[in-house]
């Protein structure tokens, strides 16, 4: 029965003179998302609102699921748009709306009118009271409850009158593409896909780098990361996934360096490679899924040691999260079941029994000097042989 959806947004509304840029970005993201749904749609801005008009038959659930993946949306409202033909006609339409949407009339309700068009002859409170009476007359089994109603009938007086009672939560945040671009270090674990989701929620476009270590990591491990990138791309839009062969670098570090420092030194070289691809792709920073104290490589001292090799900012959106908070988001975005598939990534092989938790940078520098020029050649080979997989959003 719905021919339109009203799209609610929050943060965009408090922007100043450049608000229209954020609105235009949101319209663009909505149009992109609706390509996943059958049907024809028109996305338009009108009086500080965004509407999705359906121009053909469509699947309601498909449309809602597509819109629920668009950052910047806080509410999706199936809406009936009415011409202003006077209050009595409006009341008739509201009663007809209730008949279709609420076959069981045993509910409590309130009317929430908003008079955006100030030349309408009735005040908002008058509309609330008069419409409440009309509903009670038509359906005596209903009751008014202005504090904890089961149903809220929203009536917005605009160029057309908007009537809706369902607000489906959106993901919030900012439209992707409004806050630059960054490179995500994506592994097969739980944390990094959530980090990608969280940074995209702030309007950041992302690409990704994955470190593959065949034959120690399998093709199934690689496919798992591709699948995780697809999950993140549902929200972030298209991702270019850089698959880096890290085997020779990892083996050489394992042979040349003290094992308690393996994790830190390997991560430093991962950061160097990720930064190379970030700069190549005009990214403004790196993103990791690290959280303080979660594992030995994520102590404050360890994070400082990996930061040292980077010339661009490293963003860690999960830095203060505990594991259960991260798991909850992973489950919400349908990444958890993929993340826990039992395929090892390169961070879980060659693990020291007693890794250093407070690395001494002077010691790290001395150990890295032992790697000499050979490590530079191996790094260049990894750059030259990178595989780029385009993931559609």
Predicted regions: what they are:
Residues 341-393:
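The feature marks non-catalytic terminal segments
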Residues 1-183, 193-240, 308, 356-361, ...:
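RNA-binding accessory domains that recognize and position tRNA/RNA substrates
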Residues 189:
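Conserved G/P- and acidic residue-centered "switch" motifs that form tight phosphate/ATP-binding loops
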Residues 334-342:
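A short alpha-helix-loop-beta-strand transition element characteristic
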Residues 133-135, 172-179, 250-251, 256-333, ...:
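Active-site adenylate/phosphate-handling loop in enzymes that bind or generate adenylated species
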Residues 229-255, 345-346:
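A conserved beta-strand->alpha-helix junction
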Residues 184, 208-210, 243, 288, ...:
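Structural beta-sheet core signal
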């Amino acid at each position: 029965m719905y021919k339109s959806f009203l799209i609610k947004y929050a943060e965009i509304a408090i922007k100043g003179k450049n608000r229209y840029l954020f609105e235009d970005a949101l319209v663009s993201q909505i149009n992109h998302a609706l390509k996943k749904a059958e049907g024809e749609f028109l996305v338009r801005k009108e009086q500080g609102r965004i509407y999705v008009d359906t121009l053909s038959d469509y699947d309601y659930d498909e449309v809602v699921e597509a819109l629920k993946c668009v950052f910047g949306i806080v509410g999706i409202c199936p809406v009936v748009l009415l011409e202003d033909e006077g209050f009595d006609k409006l009341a008739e339409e509201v009663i007809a709306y209730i008949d279709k949407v609420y076959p069981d009339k045993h509910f409590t309700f309130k009317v929430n009118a908003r008079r955006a068009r100030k030349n309408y002859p009735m005040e908002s409170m008058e509309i609330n009271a008069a419409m409440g009476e009309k509903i009670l007359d038509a359906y005596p089994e209903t009751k008014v409850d202005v504090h904890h109603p089961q149903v809220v009938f929203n009536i917005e007086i605009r160029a057309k009158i908007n009537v809706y009672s369902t607000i489906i939560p959106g993901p919030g945040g900012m439209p992707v593409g409004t806050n630059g671009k960054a490179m995500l270090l994506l592994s097969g674990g739980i944390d990094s896909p959530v980090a990608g989701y969280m940074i995209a929620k702030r309007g950041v476009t992302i690409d990704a780098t994955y470190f593959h270590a065949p034959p120690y990591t399998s093709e199934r491990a690689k496919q798992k990361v591709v699948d995780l990138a697809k999950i993140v791309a549902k929200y972030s839009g298209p991702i270019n996934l850089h698959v880096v062969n890290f085997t020779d670098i990892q083996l050489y570090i394992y042979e040349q360096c003290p094992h308690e420092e393996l994790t830190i030194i390997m991560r430093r070289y991962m950061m160097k490679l990720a930064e190379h691809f970030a700069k190549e792709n005009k990214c403004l920073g790196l993103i990791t899924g690290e959280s303080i104290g979660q594992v030995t490589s994520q102590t404050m001292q360890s994070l400082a040691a990996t930061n040292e090799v980077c010339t661009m900012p490293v963003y860690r959106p999960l830095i203060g999260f505990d594991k259960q908070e991260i798991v909850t988001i992973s489950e919400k975005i349908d990444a958890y079941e993929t993340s826990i598939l039992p395929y090892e990534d390169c961070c879980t092989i060659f693990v020291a029994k007693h890794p250093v938790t407070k690395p001494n940078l002077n010691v790290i520098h001395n150990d890295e000097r032992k790697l000499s020029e050979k490590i530079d050649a191996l790094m260049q080979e990894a750059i030259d042989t990178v595989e780029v997989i385009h993931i559609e959003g």
